[in-house]
């Protein structure tokens, strides 16, 4: 029985109402425990955190760290790997490449080095679930899970057309059990299927009809959201709206929020969906965050993560095939596209965000507007949609921008003049507190994901803890934690990996109507390239540990 205490730290634990109070944190067998009643009880180790900031471990609820498109991007970017830092093997760590799409081991070391202990890949094709789990075995130090793509799934659309919501619900339950996934993701609902069937097609709005299936994106969003709530999944439908990146797409985003009809919905990388303007004229590009944020503020069924853009080179990777092709045409560089049988697609294109570009500068500003205009920090999560808007390594820079309006003004002064007239960021004076930073990077994502054992330092929580050295340089504070603990063990000390542990795979196992299995099997064996018996992950295939997260009371 291993017992440890973090003594006299300045604790930020918003889930338990602790805002900068000096407290001791007791840990035993990987969990937070109450302080012993006997004052003479001695722990095996004492960490003196006097003068230091103590928070729960960070949670990235939307990133891309595994799966086929991540691996395709790794192969596409040898030039990026060559000019980026190489992580050399040590007695504890494996070697790896970095850059915008780091290798598996490097990804985990870099995340943990920032104080993050949990991460979710946001878009895994069900067919690729087995390989994603195998990649997770090479991603130590983190607990991890993934969201399963279903917004262009042909079985789902077939049953929506047939007005068989009970089969949609049963299929999603079966799919999550088969893949050991965590949540349901919809990417450009219906649009990817149109792209696959027409070659260069897409949908332009929520009421366009998807070829051959005679359903609309609105019906897909509504049907999936209802099924997710009926299955009582811990995380709501995770929505990548139609028309990502297009001028004027804010109206599509607003209609998507309305299409949920009161069901829970998480709108992801919302920055990319908040643009004013004419789709045929980029000169009209601007922000419509105030209108969208007002709607989110008044509808408690909605949460968002931002997808912040930061300047520099990165890589766009998405389950949105037509978007990948659009970026290729705009940027003129490398491009990769792939169709995933009856399930999904993807597109990849390297991109460099430039300060001198009005569009890129506005994207940077629009992301910050979302953080500053959503009234309740519990309903907005930090993300860069790694690596789409920027690497997750940019999080300390973003935190510094949110906590210091002078710093924001200094960056604005370096951007094209027109930025100031096409967004409201110059007028926003709000500055985040450390408590609010703890919410959007830890407690809030945990609540959105339904992870009751993470994101806080209360009794029974996982003992995932980050200890920071406070100072005037906020960016420096968050990019180099003093200590990072995972399940009560010190993994990182001043940026150096001291111990490697595997972490756990997080997934759900919802109940579903097994009477639907014959229908699923019949359709599957008529259309797929693999047999249905080879599709589900079997329990014995898991070489690492896994945690089944229970459903919600919603």
Q: What do these predicted ranges mean?
A:
Residues 66, 127-129, 153-156, 191-195, ...:
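Flexible loop/turn segments at secondary-structure boundaries
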Residues 164-188, 192-380:
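Histidine/acidic residue-rich metal-binding segments in metalloenzymes
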Residues 38-55:
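Active-site metal-binding motif and surrounding structural segment of the metallo-beta-lactamase
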Residues 53, 59-209, 545-546, 550:
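Divalent-metal coordination cores built from histidine and acidic residues
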Residues 77-97, 199-211, 324-349, 404-422:
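A solvent-exposed, charged loop/short amphipathic helix patch at secondary-structure junctions
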Residues 55-61, 121-122, 269, 305-307, ...:
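Active-site neighborhood of phospho(di)ester-bond hydrolases with catalytic His/Asp-centered motifs
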Residues 143-151, 258-269, 406:
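Acidic, His- and aromatic-enriched active-site or binding-groove loops in soluble protein domains
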Residues 1-41, 67, 74-75, 81-118, ...:
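Active-site microenvironment of metallo-dependent hydrolases
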